[in-house]
Amino acid sequence: MAKSYDVVIIGAGPAGIFTALELADTGLSILILEKGLDIRERIALNRDRTAPAADRRANIVSGWGGAGAFSDGKLTLTTDYGGNLDDYMNKGELARLISYVDSVYCRFGGEGRQVYGDEHRDKIHELKRKAAAADLAFIPARIRHLGTDVNGEILTHMRDSFPSHVTVKANCPVDHILVKDGKVEGVIAGGETYLCKYLVAAPGRDGAEWFTKEAESLGLHTASNAVDIGVRVESPAEIYEPITDICYESKLVYFSKSFDDRVRTFCMNPYGFVVTENNNGLMTVNGHSYAHKKSGNTNFAILVSKQFTQPFHEPIEYGKYIASLANMLGGGPIVQRLGDVRDGRRSTAERIRRGLVHPTMPSATPGDLSLVLPYRFLKDIMEMFEALDKVAPGANSRHTLLYGVEVKFYSSRIELSNQLETKIPNFFAIGDGAGITRGLAQASAAGVVVGREICARIGKPKGEI
């Protein structure tokens, strides 16, 4: 027999969690369906080095907290990047929303974690000048760095805060969304039918492909997003201290001379660690930094954004194909010295060992990224290093390590109203999996928007943010 709830939320990432937080005091019956583990089981599995490797890898991208649960916990407190919510509201509204999201993270344990970017105005101006001289755009941001360990504690506190009328079902992937006569009915998950008045789809990056197919089957208009493909860079932390000491997170954007492609840095982790990420069986790379554990290196991604034109409309499949080549050649991520890339030769374990940069992910296979990345992408990345070296001397060192590949998959973007509602009444789509956000802060903010919209519809509006 079908079970009924007022609200069903698909996905327990930041978008889904913040929707539930906004609704928690309304008395509505709420069901959160999550394909991965609940937070305590998830943390335990992440620490269990004896657990099957496949289970540990899958645990990285799904479960309570979403793909960001084991990230380095960066809250990007800016409207300049991190998503496209400014397409649905003005920047002033978005800034207030992000500030509110930050206050919620602080309330659950983030208070006291350092905010970068409020000081060093003169030094930031000088960095912008140097970047411009190198054909780079330097985009600083205010960042609250929670750290991977503190981020896990915050997610646990959030999980524990929900009253009894909020039900969480972990290990329960949603199979289908139910719509009848143009109205949302509920979902089928784990062989059970769950009916609802309001449906919030927050499937996350790991559920992006599934959600795109569901949206298309329901006749919802979608548009393909770009795919970002590149490498994770690792260098001695001292090289990037002139940037990271004054601005923990920033973006450097470059348009390549050869192809006019947009190339950018992403997710800089001072004194951090390179890690593997499991995307439905495909092993890619990412980076973390911790509040209480440090390495001697800084890592970040260099990504090339590619927006495909008609007739091609499967950027996710293209990105998966590139990642599969690295897996085929290296059995997982490949690592190569920048100097070996320039010299047209593969890296060997011996050359990596003799290098000046000691890898924080020793499990990566020394290899040849030119056999994986298309020429266009590799050329763009090499040009980016030449430009970076003018801002951070040493960036273009032959000892710099490149791990590949790093791929950022973005769901096809669903056509939404300013309330983040699909054309099907009371069916909302939010977060990275809906193609409208790209980070913790804006994904969380999207959840607040929908939570408050549902509050308004049931006659319990919340105050202005």
Where are these regions (language model features)?
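Dinucleotide-binding Rossmann-like beta1-alpha1 core, especially the glycine-rich loop
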Residues: 55-57, 63-116
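Residues forming the flavin
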Residues: 2-78, 82, 124-129, 134-465
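Structured alpha-helical segments in the cores of large, soluble enzyme domains
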Residues: 95-102, 119-133
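Glycine-centered helix-coil hinge/cap
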Residues: 88-95, 99, 117, 147-148, ...
